[in-house]
């Protein structure tokens, strides 16, 4: 089993792979996918193995970095052509996911800003940007949690609706982040989920 460090999406830079918690296997099994091929990344996004707009976006950014790092292109032109193909293919995997297009475009901007640089520099820039997007998602969700946890200090129960927990993002979730942070701070409460969205 791969260590996701409590995350749903993880960039294993040591082995240059995208690690995803396979949400189609939940709640019966915990399966972590190790992805390094474009077709496997597209399949994971298309078939809802990764769900939640923020998680999908970060998965695509990490996927682009993984594919770029694995490129055997000999010229900058070859590298850029390969990059554009990979970005376009991932973006089409789930056209309605706004964060997917946003993250792919962030990676395009990074590649474009470094288009004259040697391939190794472009790869490093894409890796750095994917790591930034990954870290930013965790930081934003954590901040939501910190602000919201203060509102829950005198609360015994919370009612939640929709998939806004940690499975929808890299780590903390959005609407449920305050519950996770409040728990970290030692506050316990009941959480009622009036809806689930299983894969049917």
Please place each PLM-identified region on the residue numbering.
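Positively charged, low-complexity intrinsically disordered leader regions
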Residues: 1-39, 43-46
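N-terminal active-site beta-alpha-beta segment that forms phosphate/nucleotide-binding
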Residues: 49, 53-200
């Amino acid at each position: 089993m791969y260590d996701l460090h409590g995350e749903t999406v993880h960039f294993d830079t040591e082995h240059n792979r995208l690690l995803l918690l396979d949400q189609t296997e939940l709640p019966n099994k915990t399966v972590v996918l190790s992805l390094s091929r474009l077709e496997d990344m597209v399949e994971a996004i298309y078939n809802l193995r990764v769900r939640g707009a923020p998680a999908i976006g970060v998965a695509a950014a990490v996927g682009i970095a993984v594919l770029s790092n694995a490129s055997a292109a000999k010229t900058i032109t070859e590298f850029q052509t390969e990059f554009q193909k990979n970005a376009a293919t991932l973006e089409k995997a789930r056209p309605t996911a706004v964060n997917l297009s946003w993250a792919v475009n962030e990676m395009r901007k990074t590649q474009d800003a470094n288009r004259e640089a040697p391939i190794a520099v472009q790869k490093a820039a894409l890796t750095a940007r994917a790591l930034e997007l990954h870290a930013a998602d965790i930081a934003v969700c954590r901040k939501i949690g910190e602000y919201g946890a203060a509102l829950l200090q005198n609360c015994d129960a919370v009612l939640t609706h929709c998939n806004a927990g940690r499975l929808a993002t890299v780590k903390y979730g959005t609407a449920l982040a305050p519950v996770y942070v409040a728990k970290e701070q030692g506050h316990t409460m009941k959480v009622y989920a009036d809806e689930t969205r299983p894969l049917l």
